[in-house]
Amino acid sequence: MDSFIAIDYETANSNYLSACALGITFVERGVVLESVQTYIKPPEEFSTFDPFNITIHKIQPSQVKNAPSFDTVWEVIEKFHSKNNVPFACHYSGFDIRVTEALLKYYNIKYQEIEFYDTFTIAKKMWPEFSNHKLNYLAQKFDIELDHHNASSDAQACALIALKQIEVLEKKSLSEVAQNYGFKLGILNSSGIKTMSNS
């Protein structure tokens, strides 16, 4: 079965560069190896915390004051990604992949091309009868423990939903699940983002 990295960001405000926490779940051959959350210190010019965001994720400015910057955090992800050449999984890649792109550009980080899979997009195709396809709704449906907007918990829930999607279709990889619905995995590289599409 597939190996991949599930990610989830929380941001201090509406700017993608204000990422203040990152949840990472490493999956190898269908087994969750580890789920971690790391706080991220946003660049100074994007570090103002919006009270609305705080009410969602409960992260305070004091908690990221001495946190590593994204370029340091990225080294951990890149080590696993480059070693295994694995795709990323996100629940609504329109946010998480755009945050990743913005931060990679800001810190001028060179990186291998990243393929990505959107559990939200596939959930809409796989379970059209569900009233919605939000992460917390799917977690409840599949008895997945979730502390919503805790980045580590969100990333792990995303990983488990991705594995559920593989299991339902009896496939071996995220790419095969996507192909089942006529999609190709999305791509993030130095030229920009190519969304997961069926075109």
Where on the chain are the PLM-derived regions?
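Conserved non-catalytic scaffold segment of RNase H-like nuclease domains
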Residues: 1-103, 113, 135, 140, ...
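Active-site catalytic microenvironments for nucleophilic, acid-base chemistry
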Residues: 103-106, 125, 141, 161-168
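Short alpha-helix plus adjacent loop in nuclease-associated cores
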Residues: 117-132
